[in-house]
Design a protein with these regions (language model features):
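Extracytosolic (periplasmic/ER-lumenal) interhelical loops and adjacent juxtamembrane/interface segments
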Residues: 1-23
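Transmembrane alpha-helix/helix-exit interface in multi-pass inner-membrane proteins
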Residues: 1-3, 32-35, 70-75
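Membrane-helix exit/interface motif
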Residues: 11-19, 37-50, 75-82
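Membrane-interfacial loop-to-transmembrane-helix junctions in polytopic alpha-helical membrane proteins
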Residues: 16-26, 50-57, 86-100
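Hydrophobic alpha-helical transmembrane segments
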Residues: 26-47, 113
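Interfacial segments of alpha-helical transmembrane regions
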Residues: 47-67
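Alpha-helical transmembrane segments of multi-pass integral membrane proteins
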Residues: 65-120
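Cytosolic juxtamembrane helix at the C-terminal end of the final transmembrane segment
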Residues: 116-133
Length: 133
């Protein structure tokens, strides 16, 4: 999965000089906000709704995902600025960061859904018990 050196080189060429510079400028600004926002969102959900205190340690998964996303963005900016001198190894490292980021973001999303579902079921159960008494 992911992308190859040939695909990166073709994309970089397709962007053109102006496109690469624009992308290199946008990535550190806008692409920095997104990981911070989604990591904070998932951390907040996991911290607030984790059913047991020991499960609140799950907050480190979205934090790590956000850090990996930022590292991936740095790799992309480096490739944008170094074009056409992009090594196969650099693309492989960027690809690893991309694939790892996807794993951590999907895992964070799944954990948030599970924790929210558990919290909702718990709230329904508590209300049902109150009606029974």
């Amino acid at each position: 999965g992911g992308y190859t050196h040939a695909e990166v080189m073709a994309a970089m060429q397709g962007y053109g000089d102006a496109g690469r510079l624009r992308y290199a400028w946008i990535s550190p600004t806008l692409d920095t906000l997104f990981p911070l926002i989604y990591a904070s969102f998932y951390v907040g959900i996991l911290y607030r709704f984790a059913p047991m205190t020991r499960l609140q340690g799950l907050v480190y998964i979205p934090i790590l995902g956000g850090v990996i996303d930022l590292a991936e963005n740095a790799q992309i900016v480096a490739m944008l600025l170094q074009y056409p001198d992009i090594s196969v190894a650099q693309v492989e490292w960027a690809n690893r960061f991309t694939l790892t980021k996807f794993i951590f973001t999907r895992l964070s999303m799944l954990m948030a859904v599970i924790v929210l579902a558990f919290a909702a079921l718990q709230a329904i159960h508590i209300r049902w018990q109150k009606r029974q008494s």
